[in-house]
Amino acid sequence: MLPIKVFSLSRIFVLLAIFRQIHAISINSSTFQVSNSFTLLNNASTLFPVPFDAYTKEYLRTSALLTCAKDSQFSASYFEAAFFPRNNTLFFNVEAQTIMSENITIKAELIAYGLNVYTKVFDLCGIQDNLLCPLKPGNIELMGSYYVEAAVASQIPSITYNIPDLDAYIVVTAYSTIDKEFTKPLACVQVMLSNGRTVQTEYLSWNLVILTISGIMFSVVYSLQGYTVTSTRLASYSISLLLYFQNLAILAMISVSFLPPIVAAWTQNFQWSMGIIRINFMQRLFDWYVVATSGSPTVVYRNKEVLSISVQKRSLNSKIISASSNLNGIESSQKNDLLYTSNLRNSNDYLSKILVLRGIKRVSYKAGIEISNFFLTGFSFFIIFICMIILAFIIFKTFLKVLQKFKVKTIRYLHFHTHWSALLQGTLYRAVFIIYSEISLLALWEFTQTDSAATLVEAIVVFILITVLLSSASVRIWRKMIKSKKIFGQPSYLLFSSSKFLNKFGFLSSQFKSTKVWWLMATSAHMLIRSILVGSLQAHGKSQSIGIFLNEAIYLILLCWMQPYMDKTTNFFNISIHSLNLVNAFFFLFFSNLFQQPIAVSSFMGLIFFFLNAAFSLYLFIFILICFTMAIYYKHPDTRYKPIDDQRRSFLKGEMDDDAVYESVPELHEMKKAVLECNGIQKPQINKIDLCKQNSNCEYLYM
């Protein structure tokens, strides 16, 4: 048996029936709620004979409550409770009010992962001290501890204290004693249980950040050293990995009806890929900025500890949520404007109701970011990212200049020294491609919020700017391929023979086959459609889920058909990622209640979602690490890879043009002039197309 027996319901009814959470915020429409403080843990420390930390490793607690009846005759201003199995002690602190004045019968149900695992019915008059029989109108204040018998506490499986993001809650319904058929509920409350374990961890997030950044940095380093093949593959793998992380983060922003706690926690680990990172001083700065630009900031997160539930006392024909309910019961109850609200701008509104936060609002709250600062947070990290790239290029160029002054050999990086401006533009184009999903979604979200005039203008400008930049780059690459194929009969020639064009746009095009560089436009369109669906349709969770599923399905079908990436390994890598993206989108069809399935189905699909994505993330992690290790191990890493069948290597110039080498180093330039003058030799003009026609092994002529 699970916690109902542990709590000895007849003895502690008040803990189950007179609930009110200190932060009455429904984090998503599944009524999952979050508390960032738990004062009873501190109060309990004075009662333990041994160090308190030894007892807090395992516990069940709750400070979250949802009213599941529209005409409940109970309300509470404060509620916290915790059970510690090491000494079988239950601590509680309750401040509640009631207008009931009759004998009450309680029906309590324990629901775990959508299944009713225990039901108990008892009469309040069975309580020994008889304080609640009959129940009288007025205030009720209880604070203390209760010892639970060891025989009862031992019935709780030990795994209950260790399952991360426990999906369990207690539904308590009050009836009049004369209502033997339980047809007219007087009150209903739902209490969420937690054991403090979660799969949301900063350690995982930072490891993924380091892995992704390392992949991109490795690709840049190998590119500067002339290992273009290795650089292209590392960059392609790292970007695909980052896009997978972004897809998980974006899925969490869909405004679904029920998001299992473990799914919400796991996807929160990837919000950094969307620039959603909390830094305290930045949040204070954003608060000031919104106010200074005549905006109306939200104060939900800052006031989370004083928000409360005020239950309306009107007959609204409520529907009680039970274990046998599907998500329709939750959806219908949350459409009641007298009990629930999603209005973030009216503090008087959500101080008297349950504030339902779905999709982007839920993600923002769980990240510790005020909802009116959501766009500014992601936008600021985009600006910081761009500035860091520019600063890194300037510092590296200055460093090379200093080395040259001290006559240190820097010939290995002469390509960067000569073409640093074009390389910087190319890196910025790559950055725009990486963050396009983030900025387009945040900007479209801001269009619907208008936190202030300044933030709206910034959203419009940055959205238009990055869309135009990425679109123009995609079109230029596609037109260059068409022109090359038309004039030379080789789509690769103009794409790879011009150092300026390659340095500027090669970061975008080199991961694709030369005949399939137009796939960049397809990828950009896929990201834009996803951003439109998630950013603009937050009030329509089912439409979002259907649109995302169709978008992923069409993209995957075309990807499998066209196979546009440079080789089989890269195609397989990307197909596997987008296959899982499609499966994840399918899960969210269930979470949106499109099929009106029982809650248990959604709960167990949430577990499958977590294990599937955790295993796949581990596979990607190992795959990328192996690629890094092999690149470092080989002295010439390009020799590991088979030549790409579009003959691009035939048209790639060396590390740099001969003239550029000599002109970059004055001593070599003067030596070259002297040798040519003495020998009367002029540099021959080589037609690479003619040579390629004459030599079947032309693919390796210009390596």
Swiss-Prot record:
What residue stretch is flagged as signal peptide?
1-24
Q: Which family does it belong to?
A: Belongs to the transient receptor potential (TRP) ion channel family.
Q: Which Pfam families match?
A: TRP, TRP_N
Residues listed as glycosylation sites in the UniProt record: N28, N43, N87, N103
Where is the protein found, in the record's own terms? Membrane
GO CC annotations on file: membrane
Protein name per the record: Uncharacterized membrane protein YOR365C
Q: GO biological process annotations for this chain's record?
A: fungal-type cell wall biogenesis; sphingolipid biosynthetic process; transmembrane transport
Extracellular side, ranges: 25-203, 260-374, 439-452, 538-545, 593-605
Topology within the bilayer: Multi-pass membrane protein
Q: Which cysteines does the record link by disulfide bonds?
A: none
Q: What is its main location?
A: membrane
Q: Which UniProt keywords apply?
A: Glycoprotein, Membrane, Signal, Transmembrane, Transmembrane helix
Please give the residue ranges for the topological domain Cytoplasmic.
225-238, 396-415, 474-516, 567-571, 627-703
Question: What lineage is on file?
Answer: Eukaryota, Fungi, Dikarya, Ascomycota, Saccharomycotina
Q: Which residues cross the membrane?
A: 204-224, 239-259, 375-395, 416-438, 453-473, 517-537, 546-566, 572-592, 606-626
